[in-house]
């Protein structure tokens, strides 16, 4: 006998009118074990350069019907790329706009993954005690040790990051100083911070989570309502080209901008980022 799982969003009792994804959507799009593989870097980087992770610090995303989606950064999209980069020899720091702790979509955490979970526990304090992004930006110069900026996905990236002058300044610094920018899924929404100032990403191509897919997820209860705006549409208005219209785990490199389409791309993006950064920085 097949047990039917509910497509109704699950109540998040920590906030009024807030909801987690439905049991059905979680059964389709999450797993207790990740697809991490290919972590093989026999000649890791030994220098001082590191990754700056710009993480989400807000959990609740309003939808069109007033209900709140309980979100944050997606664990797979955050941890798998970082696992590869760390194995390749690159340490990382975490910053949020407020300086308050990173919010994760814990309902997507691969709790039974024997590699990812110890890695997360080892670095949890970085996410719980991040730097304030404005303080990081104030210290940036041509000699700063950050080799890349990484913006993880999850719908939490839609909250605050697209309007942040500090996010814009960090991205402008990275591109001006020939650093890598890495992102996937909804993370590229952070690029919208460049809309109202110098936009060095004009003309770049990326992979990202398709707007069309976001418009479908409420049907299975992944979100409790529809988004009030769609980041792909806005990225196109600012001169960026989104090369995918589906979700296949695709990754893409445009100069030093490395992107992926979804959590299914997290492992491949980690490999791509590690390989590209080793080629650029390993002696």
From Swiss-Prot:
**Keyword presence, Cytoplasm:** yes
Listed A to Z, the keywords are:
Cytoplasm, DNA damage, DNA repair, Hydrolase, Metal-binding, Stress response, Zinc
Q: State the EC number(s).
A: 3.1.2.-, 3.5.1.-, 3.5.1.124
- GO biological-process terms attached to the record: DNA repair; methylglyoxal catabolic process to D-lactate via S-lactoyl-glutathione; protein repair
The residues the record assigns to binding Zn(2+) are 86, 91, 123
Q: Where is the signal peptide?
A: none
A GO-annotated cellular component: cytoplasm
Q: What up-regulates or down-regulates this gene?
A: By heat shock.
Q: Where is the active site?
A: 185
Where is it chiefly localized?
cytoplasm
| Molecular-function GO term, any one | protein deglycase activity
Q: State where the protein is found.
A: Cytoplasm
Q: What class of enzyme is it?
A: hydrolase
Q: Which reaction does it catalyse?
A: N(omega)-(1-hydroxy-2-oxopropyl)-L-arginyl-[protein] + H2O = lactate + L-arginyl-[protein] + H(+); N(6)-(1-hydroxy-2-oxopropyl)-L-lysyl-[protein] + H2O = lactate + L-lysyl-[protein] + H(+); S-(1-hydroxy-2-oxopropyl)-L-cysteinyl-[protein] + H2O = lactate + L-cysteinyl-[protein] + H(+); N(omega)-(1-hydroxy-2-oxoethyl)-L-arginyl-[protein] + H2O = L-arginyl-[protein] + glycolate + H(+)
Gene3D superfamilies from the xrefs? Answer: 3.40.50.880
**Function, as annotated:** Protein and nucleotide deglycase that catalyzes the deglycation of the Maillard adducts formed between amino groups of proteins or nucleotides and reactive carbonyl groups of glyoxals. Thus, functions as a protein deglycase that repairs methylglyoxal- and glyoxal-glycated proteins, and releases repaired proteins and lactate or glycolate, respectively. Deglycates cysteine, arginine and lysine residues in proteins, and thus reactivates these proteins by reversing glycation by glyoxals.
User: What's this protein's family per the entry?
Assistant: Belongs to the peptidase C56 family. HchA subfamily.
Subunit arrangement?
Answer: Homodimer.
Which protein is depicted? Protein/nucleic acid deglycase HchA
**What is the scientific name of the source organism?**
Escherichia coli O6:H1 (strain CFT073 / ATCC 700928 / UPEC)
């Amino acid at each position: 006998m097949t047990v039917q799982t509910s497509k109704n969003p699950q109540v998040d009792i920590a906030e009024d009118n807030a909801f987690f994804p439905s049991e059905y959507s979680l059964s389709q799009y999450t797993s207790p074990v990740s697809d991490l593989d290919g972590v093989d870097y026999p000649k890791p980087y030994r220098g001082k350069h590191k990754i700056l992770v710009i993480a989400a610090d807000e959990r609740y995303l309003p939808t069109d019907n007033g209900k709140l989606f309980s979100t944050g950064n997606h664990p797979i999209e955050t941890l798998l790329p970082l696992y590869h980069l760390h194995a390749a020899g690159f340490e990382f720091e975490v910053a949020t706009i407020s300086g308050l702790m990173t919010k994760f979509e814990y309902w997507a955490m691969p709790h039974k993954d024997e590699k990812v979970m110890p890695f997360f526990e080892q670095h949890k304090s970085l996410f719980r005690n991040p730097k304030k992004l404005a303080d990081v930006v104030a210290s940036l110069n041509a000699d700063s040790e950050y080799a890349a900026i990484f913006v993880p996905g999850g719908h939490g990236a839609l909250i605050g990051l697209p309007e942040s002058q500090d996010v814009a300044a960090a991205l402008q610094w990275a591109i001006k100083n020939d650093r890598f920018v890495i992102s996937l899924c909804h993370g590229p929404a952070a690029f919208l911070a460049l809309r109202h100032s110098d936009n060095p990403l004009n003309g770049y191509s990326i992979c990202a989570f398709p707007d069309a897919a976001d418009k479908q997820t409420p049907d299975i209860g992944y979100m409790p309502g529809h988004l009030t705006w769609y980041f792909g549409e806005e990225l196109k208005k600012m001169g960026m080209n989104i090369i995918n219209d589906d979700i296949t785990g695709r990754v893409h490199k445009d100069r030093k901008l490395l992107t992926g389409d979804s959590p299914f791309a997290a492992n491949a993006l980690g490999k791509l980022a590690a390989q590209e950064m080793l080629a650029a920085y390993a002696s």
